């Protein structure tokens, strides 16, 4: 792959950050580093990177600095939620800021052992970067038949540094949900300050037979941050997984969700809401493999694009040859709020089996004039009318959040990104 003009400089810096950790890194992390160096960074000429600008990131001077945060500072950034909370600061687990997990139903160990984690479903260069620079793996297990009373909240706090340097932090987690288990896991990403930083995130999840997963991702970082994430879900027979991502902050945010349905009668829901404002770019990508028959999947991805923002959606459903009775649907709906706002959408199907029911679709539009006229004629001012329409557009996604307090906090974040909000 042809690299960016400054690709070599960025790769050299990342290599140096890896070597600064000495010889304690796992063989798997070393292999990912070698793959990163062999692959190089993509350019706009590469189809999958055509709309994701990298120049503002790769010409940076990277550092890896672990800051200290007090409980009061953590609380100022935290969600108000009754959950078992694990806190990570600048890529590192901080036990003093985290809850004890004994008796919670979650077994947690943190080390650099990667023997039991699955291979990537769809590997690419920034996945290799996070796998190589993440200093440890958070191993989470929920035993057979267990149903923890509280959600597990993974809170990630990344700080920028003064000057031209960019602090880089990489987070690596793995969850094993055993047979018949049920759990809710929330990823929460925030910025400690207003300075630039670069976050890499990788989360792999095994959902065993008859297990049920509720996964929520909240990307609430600052408007000059870069965030590249790769989540993999693997489902066995009769497993269920619901994944909801709210991508609400970042100069460049690229979120990948890759899934394999490896058992019959599994059920999958993948939803996302992205709201790029000003000059932000939000790139949402899904890759779904229906590898066994009698499975059901639904995807709903929505974007609300303001100012000069750009939203990108690229999704693919692949139905294997023997995956009969597959029922898969993927929908991407986009609402443009500015004359210079842009959307690029590419939903795709690859079907190699007979007797399946699959569909995909995409819509791009602006606020309906008749809707606006109806609201204005009832004495509602233009800004309030716009906000009502936007909240209604997002409601199909926000209403899927079971916890009312969490839903209200997501709605508040949406409100900050609306015209007139504090962005």
Regions found by a protein language model. Name each.
Residues 1-202, 210-212:
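Short, low-to-moderate order helix/coil transition modules at the start of elongated helical scaffolds
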Residues 116-380, 394-397, 401-423:
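Conserved beta-strand/loop scaffold segments within soluble protein domains that form the structured core
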């Amino acid at each position: 792959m042809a690299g960016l003009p400054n690709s070599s400089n960025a790769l050299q810096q990342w290599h140096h950050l890896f070597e600064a950790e000495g010889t304690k890194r796992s063989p798997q992390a070393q292999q990912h580093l070698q793959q990163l160096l062999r692959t190089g960074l993509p350019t706009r000429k590469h189809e999958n990177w055509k709309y994701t600008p990298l120049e503002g990131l790769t010409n940076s001077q990277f550092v890896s600095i672990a800051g200290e945060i007090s409980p009061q500072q953590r609380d100022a950034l935290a969600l108000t939620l009754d959950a078992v909370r694990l806190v990570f600061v600048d890529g590192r687990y901080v036990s003093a800021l985290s809850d004890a997990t004994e008796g919670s139903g979650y077994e947690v160990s943190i080390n650099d052992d990667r023997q039991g984690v699955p291979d990537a479903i769809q590997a690419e260069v920034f996945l290799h970067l996070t796998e190589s620079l993440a200093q440890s793996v958070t191993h989470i297990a929920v035993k057979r038949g267990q149903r923890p009373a509280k959600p597990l909240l993974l809170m990630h706090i990344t700080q920028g540094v003064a000057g031209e340097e960019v602090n880089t932090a990489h987070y690596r987690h793995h969850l094993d949900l055993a047979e018949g288990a049920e759990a809710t896991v929330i990823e929460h990403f925030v910025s400690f300050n207003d300075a630039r930083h670069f976050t890499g995130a990788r989360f792999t999840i095994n959902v065993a037979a008859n297990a049920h997963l509720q996964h929520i991702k909240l990307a609430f970082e600052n408007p000059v941050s870069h965030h590249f994430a790769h989540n993999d879900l693997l489902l066995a027979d009769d497993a269920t997984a619901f994944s909801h991502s709210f991508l609400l902050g970042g100069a460049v945010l690229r979120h990948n969700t890759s899934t394999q349905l490896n058992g019959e009668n599994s059920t999958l829901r993948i939803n996302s809401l992205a709201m790029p404002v000003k000059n932000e770019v939000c790139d949402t990508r899904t890759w779904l493999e229906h590898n066994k028959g009698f499975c059901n999947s639904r995807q709903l991805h929505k974007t609300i694009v303001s100012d000069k923002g750009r939203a990108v959606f690229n999704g693919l459903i692949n139905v294997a040859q023997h995956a009969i009775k597959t029922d898969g649907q993927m929908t991407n709906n986009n609402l443009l709020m500015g004359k210079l706002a842009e959307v690029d959408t590419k939903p795709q199907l690859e079907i190699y089996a007979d007797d399946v029911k699959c569909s995909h679709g995409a819509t791009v539009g602006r606020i309906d004039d008749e809707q606006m006229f109806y609201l204005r004629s009832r004495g509602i001012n233009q800004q309030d009318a716009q906000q009502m329409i936007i909240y209604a557009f997002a409601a199909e996604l926000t209403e899927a959040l079971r916890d009312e307090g969490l839903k209200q906090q997501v709605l508040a974040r949406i409100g900050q990104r609306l015209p007139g909000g504090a962005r």
